[in-house]
Design a protein with these regions (language model features):
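C-terminal soluble interaction/assembly domains
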Residues: 306, 312-366
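Detector for small/aliphatic-rich hydrophobic stretches
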Residues: 1-126, 363
Length: 366
């Protein structure tokens, strides 16, 4: 990871800071032990939505995303495979597409922007179940089958904007499976024995006020980040601060004796609009999308789903974000290794080579 955050990374971090605490808290209040979401995927969709918005909606999205246009980069989060990368199994993609109703009247400027940025636009009868299946199949294809949500567009839908993100990468130095053993994880509701991966690594480490954070490099020079609080409670704000500092290249290199549990997180957020409204996009449930669909206000639903898993080999993660607009509706004489065992609830993030927050999550029960 080069430690230089490009514009897309900066905008994704703005979205991460605005929404992570609310999204993960809502997911956990819904009974999910582990939760994850993709700030980069959401930022990508909102950047396209901004181009199709006007009035108050445009101002609110400008305030959330900040200045600049992440859409000018063909690979804004720098995840597309490079020939020099050594892991043959590496796969990643970031894509956005739009389905517009035959009744929508998008502006030439919006269609031209989509064409310039590689956002494929289809015009169809969105009420036809075939289109819903097509959208679901597109998400499944872009996430390599990891996510296949059931989509149901109504006959009054004027637009369906979809963003997808996928990453499959190996650790730069994979864990040896024979070192994995079962040990106690101190969950909030009591201890449980889970599989821990073990090794000694030289990691970048930052000590926060009440947390310790470290990074684990991936084969592509992306990185998976971990933050382990020293006490219970909500530490999302400090975790994000430490993740962002690590993504910018901060941290002292230390020899660390690691203990990391294998885990999987999956989260579906059927109404991201509430979190967007709380973050200042007050029109999230009824956006002004005149440049996209030709009418306003437009009842709007935003849906987000994400999945993340790690094992001895590496990480696999995927996400999608859907916006439906309706008519009316990770020395020579070495010191003793520092020991970090993630044996209690902790935070995770995956950042791209440019430091963009691809995924952010919390693990309370591996």
């Amino acid at each position: 990871m080069d430690g230089v955050a490009n514009l897309a990374s900066q905008q994704a971090w703005r979205v991460a800071r605005a929404l992570s605490g609310r999204i993960l808290a809502q997911s956990e209040s819904g009974g999910n032990a582990n939760s994850v979401w993709s700030p980069a995927c959401v930022a990508n969709l909102l950047a396209v939505a901004r181009e199709g918005s006007a009035g108050a909606t445009r101002w609110e999205l400008d305030a959330l995303l900040g200045d600049g246009d992440l859409l000018v980069e063909p690979d804004p989060f720098d995840v597309e495979r490079k020939p020099a990368w050594g892991y043959d199994g590496y796969e990643a993609s970031s894509a956005t597409a739009a389905w517009l109703s035959k009744l929508a009247t998008p502006s030439d400027a919006f269609l031209r922007k989509c064409d310039e940025c590689g956002v494929h636009v289809s015009v169809d009868d969105l009420g036809d179940p075939r289109v819903s299946r097509e959208v679901s199949a597109w998400i499944s294809e872009k996430t390599r089958g990891l996510l296949s949500p059931a989509i149901s567009l109504s006959s009054v839908a004027l637009a369906c904007l979809v963003s997808a993100l996928y990453l499959k990468d190996a650790w730069a130095d994979p864990f040896e499976e024979y070192l994995t053993n079962r040990a106690l994880f101190h969950a909030e509701d009591g201890g449980v024995r889970v599989a821990f991966m073990h090794d000694e690594r030289c990691c970048r480490v930052i000590d926060g006020d009440d947390c310790v954070a470290f990074g684990m490099p991936l084969s592509s020079d992306a990185e998976m980040l971990f933050t382990l609080p020293n006490s219970g409670g909500d530490h999302m704000g400090e975790a994000l601060e430490l993740f962002e500092r690590l993504s910018c290249g901060e941290g002292e290199r230390e020899l660390v004796e690691l203990g990391i549990p294998r885990f999987e997180c999956e989260t579906t957020i059927p109404d991201l609009g509430m979190q967007l409204e709380a973050a200042g996009v007050y029109s999230a449930s009824a956006m002004n999308l005149v440049p996209m669909v030709g009418v306003e206000p437009t009842p709007t639903q935003v849906i987000h789903g994400a999945k993340l898993s790690i094992d001895e080999k590496g990480v696999e993660a995927g996400a999608y974000t859907i916006m439906i607009a309706c008519a009316g509706c990770p020395p020579e004489n070495p010191p003793e290794p520092r020991k970090i065992t993630l044996n209690r609830p902790f935070y995770v993030a995956v950042v791209s080579r440019t430091g963009a927050p691809l995924f952010v999550g919390r693990v309370t029960l591996p």
